[in-house]
Structure formats: C-alpha cells, structure tokens
Amino acid sequence: MSETGATPTAARTARMERTTSESSVLVEINLDGSGVSDISTSVPFYDHMLTALCKHSLIDMTVKATGDTHIDAHHTVEDVAITFGEVLRQALGNKAGIRRFGEATVPLDEALAHAVVDVSGRPYLVHGGEPAGQEYHLIGGHFTGSLTRHVFEAITLHAGICLHMNVLAGRDPHHIVEAQFKAFARALRAAVESDPRVEGIPSTKGAL
C-alpha cells in the first residue's frame, strides 16, 4: 500500500491519494465549501450517497476511485471511506474554534435516521436500528446494505470522531441508507462549523 499524505491548509482543506492492490483512491475536501461534489467510485449508488453527503454537509469534495469492483464493491467502498476519514481529520487540524458536537434527524419518506457527532479525537461508532435483513439487500446492483456500517466504521476510525447512528424507521433499503448518509452529513456540518464564541480548542483537556 502507498499513501500520499493528506496535506492540510489554513483554509481547512486536505488532499490524499491512497493505493493498494485492491483500489486506487484520491479524495480532496474543503470543509468551508458549499457542497460541490465531483464523485466517481465505479459504484453508482455509493456515488449517489457521497454526493448527498457533500450537498447536506456543505463540504466540497472530489473523489476519484478505481478498484476490483468486478470481484466485489467492498474494497473500493471501504477504501474511499478510509481516505475520506483521513482527509477529514487532517483538514480539521487542531480543531480550534469548532462547535465539536452536531446532531440531526433526517427523514426520507418512510425512513428516519438520527445521527450525533462528536469531533472528540476518540473514534467510536454506535450503529443500530436497521430492520432485520437490511444488510443483505443489494442496492443499485453493487452496494449491499452491510456496507453502510463499514463506511461509518472506516470514517469514524480514521477521522477520530464519535458517531451514534440510529435508524428510527424505514422499509425501503435505499431510503434507509440514504437517510443515514444525510443525517450524518447534517450532524457533521454542525460539528465542524466554526463558532465565533469559541476561543481555542473546545475541550477542558485543551486538546482533541
């Protein structure tokens, strides 16, 4: 595996290339954007979810990924999430002046998802509430429902954030996944926003 290290700037941007025998991934983000996205992962439903993530988090993001999707989408999907987590962590820098916490409850027709984010520096995921069998559904021809948890696991681990994600209602597998991505996006947007009332790092420890 080779990685070109994520490079942060004062503008809260970062870029990273990550290459393994299974995938090649480029991710570039701007936390202070307007939700502009340029996404190509070779997994159309995942492209749709990442585009929604950008739109509702207001993070500008470019993703270019190729991988062994002829075998399974898992490697490419997870490697993109790993790389996104890494650039998110780098773009946040020392986290000075951010709100740190964010929460959102988002519906999509019959589906409803609740997300809470803490940019704590301590990776942790609590993920629940999906209806029985959701993990076995094939969505859009390539994306299995089980990948949703893998995506959030990879992001939280590599970004160093805590995420509680709970599906409160839902029947359609597509809607259940999309509501989660949108809830995460809105919670993340709130958590990484600059708060003019915050001086320094929002932690009694003085570091996150």
Curated annotation (Swiss-Prot):
GO terms for cellular component: cytoplasm. The keyword Chaperone does not apply. Pathway: Amino-acid biosynthesis; L-histidine biosynthesis; L-histidine from 5-phospho-alpha-D-ribose 1-diphosphate: step 6/9. Gene3D superfamilies: Imidazole glycerol phosphate dehydratase, domain 1 (3.30.230.40). CDD domains: IGPD. GO terms for biological process: L-histidine biosynthetic process. This is Imidazoleglycerol-phosphate dehydratase. PROSITE patterns: IGP_DEHYDRATASE_1, IGP_DEHYDRATASE_2. It comes from the Bacteria. Belongs to the imidazoleglycerol-phosphate dehydratase family. NCBIfam families: PRK00951.1-6, PRK00951.2-1, PRK00951.2-4. The gene is hisB. Keywords: Amino-acid biosynthesis, Cytoplasm, Histidine biosynthesis, Lyase. It is an enzyme of class 4 (lyase). One of its GO terms (molecular function) is imidazoleglycerol-phosphate dehydratase activity. Coiled coil: none annotated. It comes from Paenarthrobacter aurescens (strain TC1). It catalyses: D-erythro-1-(imidazol-4-yl)glycerol 3-phosphate = 3-(imidazol-4-yl)-2-oxopropyl phosphate + H2O. Its EC number is 4.2.1.19.
